[in-house]
Amino acid sequence: QPSWRKAAKDDGTTGWSQWVQNNIFGFGDWAKTRPANAWYCMHLWQHYTFTLNKSYLKKTAYRVMKGACDFWLGRLVESESGLVAPKEWSPEIGPWNVEGGVAYAQQLIFDLFSNTVKATEVLEIDTAYRNKLVATLKKLDKGLKIGTWGQLMEWNDEAIEKKHSGPKNTHRHLSHLIALYPGSQISPLIDTAYSNAAKTSLIGRGDFSTGWALAWRLACWARLLDGNHAHQLLKNSLVHITSTKITYNEGGVYENLLNGPPFQI
């Protein structure tokens, strides 16, 4: 049985989920990263929006998106802030499986449900299922909360937030900003309060990191309509480096144009 199917059954729900590491045969290992099913589906939907290929949407993307929705419809639980994903984490920072409603998971689930609703409208199918998703979206915690220093909160719990996501934490990951990029829930064209909070979080994370993390920062600044800052990040990411030691705040490119250190895809 493929790991992506077994992962959902192990969690007592239907649909599919996956592990941190997965191979082309449908198997994975190490640990679960449940919200990544929504992240995968984000790119399926984006492929449709760029191509407008209804055949692709109907035959390939939609059934995968619907399966991911089935998983979350069965896993979400009630909380004071609304429906939340229980026992989640914020890759790759902070404690594992201790808090429900982590921004990373909530933002991805909102994106998944919203895009799947749009898919049913485009394909003119599954009206009852669409209505179920719409009703769930109304009760869903969207993963957008502004914290004490004006940041977009990564965690619900203030103590965890203060310890792991403070204003001087220059961690490479921007998991709580996935609604800004590659998602589209946050934008200065939609709501300046949340886009300003995302900007504050970006400033806290800093402009120096690994190669891939600089690319993520660059894209986030572009989404905030700050071309000058995005250009600076582009220059930072193209700095020539020669070091072979593992470091997380000196990203750049080697002479062969591979990024690092460390090299990651």
Residue locations for each model-derived region?
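Active-site core of glycosidic bond-cleaving carbohydrate-active enzymes
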Residues: 1-3, 22-25, 29-54, 59, ...
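Carboxylate/His-rich catalytic cores and anion/metal-binding grooves
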Residues: 1-13
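Beta-strand segments within the central parallel beta-sheet cores of soluble alpha/beta enzyme folds
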Residues: 57-67, 83-88, 232-236
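Acidic/histidine-rich catalytic neighborhood
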Residues: 67-122
